[in-house]
Amino acid sequence: MAKLDKEQVIDDALILLNEVGIEGLTTRNVAQKIGVEQPTLYWHVKNKRALLDALAETILQKHHHHVLPLPNETWQDFLRNNAKSFRQALLMYRDGGKIHAGTRPSESQFETSEQQLQFLCDAGFSLSQAVYALSSIAHFTLGSVLETQEHQESQKEREKVETDTVAYPPLLTQAVAIMDSDNGDAAFLFVLDVMISGLETVLKSAK
């Protein structure tokens, strides 16, 4: 077998994540999937927490592409596009939201975070406002992903069990259909635009 490297460990762990979810993911079964003894894995990931942190970082590196503003992009468009890209990256993998929850920027992400803050400060926000804007939208996006993925998992369980049809009132019937129609995309964009509109008000009131 060729020499094991961390990239292979993470790639195989991501495949396994889609198969078993975060609860079923262990360093033991990652080692089994790769075909090595568990102690060999410890050269690259010391424990499950280190494995999850590495997975979170890799998911963003591979799939979160709109991390910095494009030339002439407005701060509103950047926040919107950044959040959409972040959400899409987390939805690429089973339990992607849970994998990311609780993490902080790694050293490789420091410069990106610095440039994001500087961009918002240059747009007129104070540093604290820039921090709150970025963190609030990130937390909302993560919450949206967690809710979407939990709904997907619970829906799979419901489909395994025969249940009686529930008779909803007319408006609630339509509301359920709306919420189930597009994986939560429209609801996410609606609230995201509300948040950005609120930030526009904050910026205007500061002038």
Curated annotation (Swiss-Prot):
Listed SUPFAM superfamilies: Homeodomain-like (SSF46689), Tetracyclin repressor-like, C-terminal domain (SSF48498)
Listed PROSITE patterns: HTH_TETR_1, HTH_TETR_2
DNA-binding region extent: 26-45
Induction notes from the record: By the [Mg-tetracycline]+ complex.
Residues reported in the UniProt entry to bind Mg(2+): 100
Gene Ontology terms for molecular function: DNA-binding transcription factor activity; metal ion binding; transcription cis-regulatory region binding
Domain HTH tetR-type: 3-63
Protein keywords: Antibiotic resistance, DNA-binding, Magnesium, Metal-binding, Plasmid, Repressor, Transcription, Transcription regulation
Alphabetical list of InterPro entries matching this protein: DNA-bd_HTH_TetR-type_CS, Homeodomain-like_sf, HTH-type_TetR-like_transc_reg, HTH_TetR, Repressor_TetR_C, Tet_transcr_reg_TetR, Tet_transcr_reg_TetR-rel_C_sf
Domain of life: Bacteria
Annotated tetracycline binding sites: 64, 82
GO biological process, one term: negative regulation of DNA-templated transcription
Function (record text): TetR is the repressor of the tetracycline resistance element; its N-terminal region forms a helix-turn-helix structure and binds DNA. Binding of tetracycline to TetR reduces the repressor affinity for the tetracycline resistance gene (tetA) promoter operator sites.
Protein name from the UniProt record: Tetracycline repressor protein class H
Native organism taxonomy: Bacteria, Pseudomonadati, Pseudomonadota, Gammaproteobacteria, Pasteurellales
